[in-house]
């Protein structure tokens, strides 16, 4: 164990500060009850930073993140920023530079449907049975979103636009290794998603993933075309454990997996580099419509802490305890408004309190 874990806390906009307060409760328990040497420092980001510093990602925030072992992020892009254009740019001008600066190439999006919340899924109960637990691993810094050339032109009065899907072998290699390494901590299954019957980039993707798999003979590898994969997830999500995807395909399929859980407010995410430095955040947005009402679900932010403990601190046992605390309160029937099927639900701070109590008591 390290002598000190430095965490940069970036609450951000919208419901970010509200749910981050509940994450602090968990961090304080880790310090005071589990004796973890955690040090937190808070920094501005997003619309809040634009209001105060004129930019979405101030230099002091970036420096604070550089001097940390991990970043715990709330949300960005609140309507409070000066203009609608600035609000739309807040997420792009904060998260994207952070991902680029720290080379956060691996995006982890868990999509777990708890047996206690099966009624929330849009899928039939006979399809989802007792829930599912999928981890989408998306390559985050390559592919068609960053490929050059890209643009929009006009020739002979005909307008056209173009993008370039490009992948280098090292980009595929490192995301594949990450997927197989994580498979060994789960159920030893990886399903790689591509379109290798059409795309050259996908042919290379499949070749390299297949080659990397030889280093992990105990992990079962399968391949699916993206169109078939989207159908299979709806037909039988429980057949999957880890889905390995390119940037574009992962963007689409991770949202599909999130939607079939029926509760985006429950889902955390992580973006990692090769040294397991990570940015951890809820998968949902800043939800400005419920900002300040104390009704946001803090579970995604709390589970983001769990992912931070699991991947950047490498403390699986303690991460499991945080996850179990969430399951415990769900089994007892505690709900926030977004996952409640009646008018009786806990406020944001109340849900944070019951999860914190469950973590302390070991329930």
UniProtKB/Swiss-Prot annotation:
Assembly mode: Homodimer.
Chain positions of site Important for catalysis: 145, 195
Gene Ontology biological process: L-leucine biosynthetic process
Record keywords, A-Z: Amino-acid biosynthesis, Branched-chain amino acid biosynthesis, Cytoplasm, Leucine biosynthesis, Magnesium, Manganese, Metal-binding, NAD, Oxidoreductase, Plasmid
Cofactor note: Binds 1 Mg(2+) or Mn(2+) ion per subunit.
Top-rank taxon: Bacteria
Gene3D superfamilies associated with the record: Isopropylmalate Dehydrogenase
Underlying gene: leuB
Pathway: Amino-acid biosynthesis; L-leucine biosynthesis; L-leucine from 3-methyl-2-oxobutanoate: step 3/4
Residues reported to bind substrate: 99, 109, 138, 227
Protein name: 3-isopropylmalate dehydrogenase
Any one GO cellular component localisation term in the record: cytosol
UniProt similarity note: Belongs to the isocitrate and isopropylmalate dehydrogenases family. LeuB type 1 subfamily.
Subcellular location: Cytoplasm
Function description: Catalyzes the oxidation of 3-carboxy-2-hydroxy-4-methylpentanoate (3-isopropylmalate) to 3-carboxy-4-methyl-2-oxopentanoate. The product decarboxylates to 4-methyl-2 oxopentanoate.
PROSITE patterns for this protein: IDH_IMDH (PS00470)
Alphabetized GO MF terms: 3-isopropylmalate dehydrogenase activity; magnesium ion binding; NAD binding
């Amino acid at each position: 164990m390290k002598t000190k874990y430095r965490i940069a806390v970036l609450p951000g906009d919208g419901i970010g500060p509200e749910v981050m307060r509940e994450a602090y409760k968990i961090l304080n328990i880790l310090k005071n009850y589990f004796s973890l040497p955690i040090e937190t420092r808070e920094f501005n980001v997003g619309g809040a930073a634009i209001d105060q510093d004129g930019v979405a990602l101030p230099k002091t925030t970036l420096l604070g993140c550089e001097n940390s072992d991990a970043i715990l992020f709330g949300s960005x892009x609140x309507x409070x920023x000066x203009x609608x254009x600035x609000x739309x740019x807040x997420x792009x001008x904060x998260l994207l530079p952070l991902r680029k600066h720290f080379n956060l190439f691996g995006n982890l999006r868990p999509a777990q449907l708890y047996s206690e919340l099966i009624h929330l899924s849009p899928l039939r109960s006979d399809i989802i049975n007792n829930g599912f637990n999928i981890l989408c691993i998306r390559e985050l810094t390559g592919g068609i979103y960053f490929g050059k050339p890209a643009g929009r032109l006009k020739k002979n009065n005909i307008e056209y636009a173009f993008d370039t899907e490009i992948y280098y072998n090292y980009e595929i290699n490192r995301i594949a290794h990450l997927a197989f390494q994580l498979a060994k901590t789960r159920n030893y299954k990886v399903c790689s998603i591509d379109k290798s019957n059409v795309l050259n980039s996908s042919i290379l993707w499949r070749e390299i993933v297949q080659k990397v798999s030889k280093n992990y003979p105990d992990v079962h590898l399968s391949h699916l075309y993206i169109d078939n994969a989207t159908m299979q997830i709806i037909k039988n999500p429980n057949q999957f454990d880890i889905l390995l995807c390119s940037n574009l395909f992962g963007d689409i399929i991770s949202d599909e997996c999130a939607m079939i859980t029926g509760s985006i407010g429950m889902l955390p995410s992580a973006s990692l580099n090769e040294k397991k430095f990570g940015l951890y955040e809820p998968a949902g947005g800043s939800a400005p419509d419920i900002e300040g009402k104390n009704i946001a679900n803090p579970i995604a932010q709390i589970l983001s802490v769990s992912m931070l403990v699991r991947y950047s601190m490498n403390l699986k046992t303690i991460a499991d305890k945080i996850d179990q605390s969430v399951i415990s309160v769900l089994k007892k029937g505690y709900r926030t408004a977004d996952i409640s099927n009646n008018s009786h639900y806990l406020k944001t701070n109340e849900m944070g309190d019951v999860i914190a109590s469950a973590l302390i008591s070991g329930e």
